[in-house]
Amino acid sequence: EATARRALEITQRWAVRSLKARGDSPQSMFAIVQGALYPHLRKQSADGLTQLPFDGFAIGGLAVGEEKSQREDTCEVAAAMLPADRPRYLMGVGTPLDLLEAVHRGVDMFDCIIPNKVAQFGTAFTSRGLLQLRRSVYKFSDEKLDPACGCPVCRKYSDRKSVV
């Protein structure tokens, strides 16, 4: 806990410094709420950062090896501490199920390398799970990437043979 507390204090100092350095720039800035898996440290972090004029708040320090249930519980606790009128951003979480779980817990934005890495290996996320597009069965397939999906990409632009 002592290490998490020190990291939180450093983050708070950097938050203040970053706002001063931004000056009058119109660029959006997000603060990163820290505190590891300790709800009282998350609260301390959120209480301090939400008093500052940040445009949004990132929930940091998750998706780094903790159990999925711990990540989800901590995400829910942290998101509930943040203002609903500004974006709440979860860093480093990117599987479809993880995104849905995070939205359910109050998160608005995400970034993660997982979709990119999955795509690099010729795989796509679909409503039925992962689809291995480099399999020979899809070489001449006119079937849509995800027939159950109504998004513009799945509806108009992607048959399985063209995606890879």
Region locations from a protein language model:
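Residues immediately within or flanking Cys/His clusters that coordinate Zn2+
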Residues: 148
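Glycine-rich phosphate/ribose-binding loops and adjacent secondary-structure elements
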Residues: 21-30, 34-145
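Cys/His-rich metal-chelating microdomains
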Residues: 157
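Short cysteine clusters
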Residues: 151-154
